[in-house]
Amino acid sequence: MMVLKVEELVTGKKNGGGDAGEFLPEDFRDGEYEAAVTLEKQEDLKTLPAHFVSLGEQQWKIEKEREAELKKKKLEQRSKLENLEDLEIIIQLKKRKKYRKTKVPVVKEPEPEVITEPVDVPRFLKAALENKLPVVEKFLSDKNNPDVCDEYKRTALHRACLEGHLAIVEKLIEAGAQIEFRDMLESTAIHWASRGGNLDVLKLLLNKGAKISARDKLLSTALHVAVRTGHYECAEHLIACEADLNAKDREGDTPLHDAVRLNRYKMIRLLITYGADLNVKNCAGKTPMDLVLNWQNGTKAIFDSLKENSYKASRIATF
């Protein structure tokens, strides 16, 4: 019995001997290359004289041939891709298999924090900012003043309103926190909720009696603040609650002045839709329309300058 060469195995060509152990091209169809390689490795045994093959080796050879035959049958049973539908089916099966293997992580809910020691003012104010309700509850349960504040007169309510921590806002109000308490710039909770863009907190404050007309040190209303910070939903809700569309701040600017100056198109459209006055003048004698024209003229001047500089540069480049 002759030994197959590697090139004979790969090409499937026969040599002149025509032994029964050799492979033909049809042996390599349908992905049977691996099975053929396994059989080729077993051909080495046939090169030994018959008297050198022990009983144990014969048994090992039979087992290997059986394994190769099983592998060949498995290869023959694989689906053949005849069209795109077959490919789609295989893709879907692989996806399902992958999905079955993927373990859904079990998310454990954090255990409620139990506070036993007294809570001081700095920790209380920080807890309101970071939404740590157990700390806030412990501070309030010890009959402490909910309106304690920092060096800028900002209370826990101000901080919670800014961050949108609704549960803490509710707890503070239940404990008697003053909704109209003013910080160093005379901002109230409604200003802070508008600044943070927290609609649910804003609604709660208004339902609890917060003054929609409250003004800070710059005479800004909550609507001014919502427009400046770009919180559309808060501005819309304040308008729906009859906030003054034409209220002037210390510089005489209305919310529409601010919207035009900051080029907030959606705010401009909202305010005009609900009837904001286009002709109200600020302390500089400018109406919102004047600001639009100034902005357009300023933009035009910038483009004219860029155009002129570009022309000069091109002229220099030609020389």
Curated annotation (Swiss-Prot):
Lineage of the organism: Eukaryota, Metazoa, Chordata, Craniata, Vertebrata
Its biological purpose: May play an important role in endothelial cell activation. May act as a nuclear transcription factor that negatively regulates the expression of cardiac genes.
Species per Swiss-Prot/TrEMBL record: Sus scrofa
Recorded GO MF terms: actin binding; RNA polymerase II-specific DNA-binding transcription factor binding; titin binding
Intracellular or extracellular location(s): Nucleus
Up-regulation conditions: Down-regulated by doxorubicin (adriamycin), in vitro.
Record SMART domains: ANK (SM00248)
Keyword Coiled coil: yes
Keywords: ANK repeat, Coiled coil, Nucleus, Repeat
GO cellular component terms given for this protein: cytoplasm; nucleus; perinuclear region of cytoplasm
The protein's name in its UniProt record: Ankyrin repeat domain-containing protein 1
Classification via InterPro entries: Ankyrin_rpt, Ankyrin_rpt-contain_sf
Keyword Repeat among UniProt keywords: yes
Free-text tissue specificity from the UniProt record: Expressed in heart. In postnatal neonatal heart, it is expressed in an asymmetrical way; left ventricle favored towards right ventricle. Whether or not this could be correlated with a hypertrophic heart is still a matter of debate. Levels increase gradually from newborn to adult.
Coiled coil: 63-89
Description of how the protein assembles with itself and partners: Interacts with TTN/titin and YBX1.
GO biological process: regulation of transcription by RNA polymerase II
